[in-house]
Amino acid sequence: RGTAVKVDNELPLADAAIFGCAVMTGVGAVLNTARIRAGDTVACVGLGGVGLNGLLGAKLAGAEKIIAVDVNDDKLGLARQLGATHTVNAKDKDHVEQIKDITAGGVDYAFEFAGSVAATETCYKSIKMGGQVIIAGLAPSTSLFSFSPPDIVTSEKAIRGSYMGSCVPVRDIPRYIELYRQGKLAVDKLINKSIGFGEVNDGFDKLTDGLVIRQILEPHIT
């Protein structure tokens, strides 16, 4: 009961469903864990449902530069529509250098939303002196990320974890829903389609292949 949040009947259930994980984790990582301020520079690495919500959170907070990073050009295009000021394809060998060039040395905050060691490495290399890496993606439990202790000392970098966006559901979900209603958090643009039980396996395949952001499972659909 501590994590059950009542929503009123005016909010469509299909819209409400996305707030339970993707919105909390992405927006929360930016607003709660990092607590970015207006004028900060941000890189969102990994543009699934969580990463794109992180981008929306950065826009809401007034970040000066929001750099969207992914290997999928379609997702980079969507990121621009949602408010990214710059996009970088992580397939480019010089993608870290591109991020540094955009920000004259590195971002204040780099958010790892992809759940991979490679994305974490991109984040670490892309932050400026005194910058922070916020890891919100869940890599496989056997994954290891290595860094140079002298480098993290002399550069005063920080690496932090963010579990479910450091959210308290009964506090944060109503707040995010209200922002959505005010048109400040366009989470509905992340929903590709509704599917029925017969499409579940295909839906998971599309999610794995990066062909969709979020799908809503509606049992009555045949």
Residue map of PLM features:
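Rossmann-fold dehydrogenase core element
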Residues: 131-134, 147-189
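Structural detector of well-ordered beta-strand residues that form the stable sheet scaffold
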Residues: 43, 67, 132-134, 160, ...
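Conserved beta-strand scaffold positions in the cores of enzyme catalytic domains, especially
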Residues: 4, 87, 159-161, 190, ...
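Mid-domain Rossmann-like dinucleotide-binding core that forms the NAD(H)/NADP(H) cofactor-binding site
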Residues: 2-3, 8-93, 97-98
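Hydrophobic alpha-helical segments typical of transmembrane helices
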Residues: 25, 54, 75, 95, ...
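Glycine-rich cofactor phosphate-binding loops and adjacent beta1-alpha1 units
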Residues: 34-37, 50, 71, 77-158, ...
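C-terminal hydrophobic helical "lid"/dimerization subdomain
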Residues: 109, 121-125, 170-222
